Amino acid sequence: MDRHLDKIFLRGLVVHTRIGPCGKAALTSLEADLEVAIDLSFAVSSDKLSDTANYSDLARAISDVLMSSRHPNLGEAASAAAEAVLSTEQKVCEVLLTLRNSRVVLKGPVDQIGVSVRKCRR
């Protein structure tokens, strides 16, 4: 995420979804962090909200994808959510989306597992 673009971020969006083998039986809470690369120069000079990305729309795009169907794994879920952000907001050039799951059972002391995906507009 360089290209000298500005960044907008959302941190700690919690979404309840069905994911992985355990998702057949119960909902899992995932935490999402989003960072988007966007040119904010028009928004700064115009002072119009329509010249920037809508935070609510970004959060809704992620939530809708994660809640709409059961995902086989974190990587697929993150990829689908990142693509939804690009589809929702045409001003966004690049998306970095991280999904974390803190309700995981692994051998050894692990607080969370997660995945980050980066998607670029073509």
Language model segments and positions:
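N-terminal, polar/charged subdomain of small-to-medium soluble alpha/beta proteins
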Residues: 1-122
